[in-house]
């Protein structure tokens, strides 16, 4: 999703009900929930566009486990979320990172940004996903920066990059399997290299990949790692592999797609004095952190039984916004209003 149509406003410093740190699916849906609860809000997003990982890493990936969508492209889901939230005109600050916060004597919060702006709100919600993320690389390849973006990729942002190409995909998780099948109709040839003896991704997709292998449509090399690359300038020529048994093979290739995961880093949020567990923020059943009035939702929130999927993040956002309203208006009975009733009133 580009920021076209997004009301990306400059820092105003005006007091709003809720500041949302993070503009991924959870953060966008939290903004919608604010509108549903007649709350003003702002989103602070460090990237130049909303959508989080869906926009930055997987805009053309298809998603199948979001309610009511049999199949939806990641960028399309972000667009739909923004269409839903945008009707309430939330303030959106792009290309700026929340670096610290201060809780004032009156219970409100001030968030300070990397650009030197200050944002004040009555409550605070962190929906920053996994934090900052960098792709895992293969150290044995050395400096490959000259190949990145031309023949070496860590995600698929445009299928066209691989059309008619001989593609080697490294990995055995969900992303590797999804893109093996996703690029199969476009690429001249797809070869999968995986260091383990079996795939770790979703069973259904794994079977599809193995069936394609049986049909001779793709090659799969288990117990094998990439040992080195043969290149010419910024162009990849061959991928040299070595199996655990010592067998070496040279694969002609135009593109190398490393889908072996990302390293996440909470960044400045890790220094905010919140209770953390496994690089995530501990919350209670109201999505409240160890600081009263400060909430967390989505992948960055940790609680027993948590599943890090989009659907859960949307639920987290709903809970967090709802309970933040109780913090903002202590002692006031918060009544639930069905969306159909609210929308009918808005249309009058």
From Swiss-Prot:
Entry GO MF terms: ferredoxin-NADP+ reductase activity; flavin adenine dinucleotide binding; NADP binding
Cofactors demanded by this protein: FAD
Top EC class of this enzyme: oxidoreductase
Endpoints of the signal sequence: none
Keyword Oxidoreductase: yes
Catalytic reaction list: 2 reduced [2Fe-2S]-[ferredoxin] + NADP(+) + H(+) = 2 oxidized [2Fe-2S]-[ferredoxin] + NADPH
Pfam families: Pyr_redox_2
Record note on quaternary structure: Homodimer.
Family: Belongs to the ferredoxin--NADP reductase type 2 family.
Enzyme Commission numbers on file: 1.18.1.2
Keywords: FAD, Flavoprotein, NADP, Oxidoreductase
Keyword Oxidoreductase annotated: yes
Record-given protein name: Ferredoxin--NADP reductase
Binding site for FAD: 26, 45, 53, 58, 98, 133, 299, 340
Gene3D superfamilies, A to Z: FAD/NAD(P)-binding domain
Cofactor mode of binding and number, as noted: Binds 1 FAD per subunit.
């Amino acid at each position: 999703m580009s920021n076209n149509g997004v009301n990306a406003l400059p820092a105003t410093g005006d007091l709003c009900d809720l500041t949302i740190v993070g503009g991924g699916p959870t953060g966008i849906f939290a903004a919608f929930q604010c509108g549903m609860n007649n709350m003003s809000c702002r989103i602070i997003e460090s990237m130049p566009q909303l959508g989080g990982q869906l926009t930055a890493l997987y805009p053309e990936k298809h998603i199948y486990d979001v309610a009511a969508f049999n199949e939806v492209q990641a960028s399309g889901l972000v667009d739909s979320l923004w269409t839903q939230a945008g009707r309430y005109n939330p303030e959106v600050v792009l290309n700026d990172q929340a670096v610290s916060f201060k809780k004032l004597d009156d219970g409100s919060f001030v968030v300070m940004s990397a650009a030197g702006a200050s944002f004040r709100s009555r409550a605070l919600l962190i929906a920053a996903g996994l934090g900052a993320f960098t792709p895992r690389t293969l150290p044995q390849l050395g400096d490959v920066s000259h190949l990145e973006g031309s023949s070496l990729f860590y995600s698929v942002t445009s299928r066209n990059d691989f059309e008619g190409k001989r593609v080697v995909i490294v990995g055995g998780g969900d992303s590797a399997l999804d893109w093996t099948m996703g690029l199969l109709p476009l690429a001249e040839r797809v070869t999968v290299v995986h260091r383990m003896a079996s795939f770790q991704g979703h069973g259904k997709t794994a079977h599809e990949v193995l069936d394609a292998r049986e049909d001779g449509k793709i090659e799969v090399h288990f117990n094998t790692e990439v040992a080195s690359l043969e290149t010419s300038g910024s162009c990849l020529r061959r991928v040299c592999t070595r199996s655990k048994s010592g067998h070496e093979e040279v694969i002609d290739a135009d593109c190398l797609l490393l889908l072996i995961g990302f390293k996440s880093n909470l960044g400045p949020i890790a220094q905010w004095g919140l209770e953390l567990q496994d690089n995530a923020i501990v919350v209670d059943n109201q999505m409240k952190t160890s600081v009263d009035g400060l909430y967390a939702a989505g992948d960055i929130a940790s609680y027993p039984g948590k599943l890090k999927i989009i659907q859960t993040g949307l639920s987290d956002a709903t809970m967090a916004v709802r309970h933040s309203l109780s913090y903002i208006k202590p002692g006031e009975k918060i009544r639930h209003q069905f969306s159909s009733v609210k929308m009918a009133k808005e249309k009058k």
